[in-house]
């Protein structure tokens, strides 16, 4: 039998102020967080904490 997929997946977070320039990768549990994730992380381009949103 095939093993079922795990709940954890790798997602990419992209800065909203500098789109397409700076990204982070992290993991999330798709059962607990089915919606797109948003985190405040440090953006070295703007040199401050910005909102990073999950991209597909």
From Swiss-Prot:
Gene3D superfamilies cross-referenced by the UniProt entry: Ribosomal protein L33 (2.20.28.120)
Gene: rpl33
Superkingdom as given in the UniProt entry: Eukaryota
Family, per entry: Belongs to the bacterial ribosomal protein bL33 family.
Main location (coarse class): plastid
SUPFAM superfamilies in alphabetical order: Zn-binding ribosomal proteins
Phylogenetic placement of the source organism: Eukaryota, Cryptophyceae, Pyrenomonadales, Pyrenomonadaceae, Rhodomonas
Stated name of the protein: Large ribosomal subunit protein bL33c
PROSITE patterns in the record: RIBOSOMAL_L33 (PS00582)
A GO MF label: structural constituent of ribosome
Keyword entries, A-Z: Chloroplast, Plastid, Ribonucleoprotein, Ribosomal protein
GO cellular component: chloroplast; ribonucleoprotein complex; ribosome
UniProt cross-references to PANTHER family, sorted A to Z: 50S RIBOSOMAL PROTEIN L33, CHLOROPLASTIC (PTHR43168), LARGE RIBOSOMAL SUBUNIT PROTEIN BL33C (PTHR43168:SF2)
Keyword Transport: no
A single BP term in Gene Ontology: translation
Places the protein is found: Plastid, Chloroplast
Pfam families, alphabetized: Ribosomal_L33
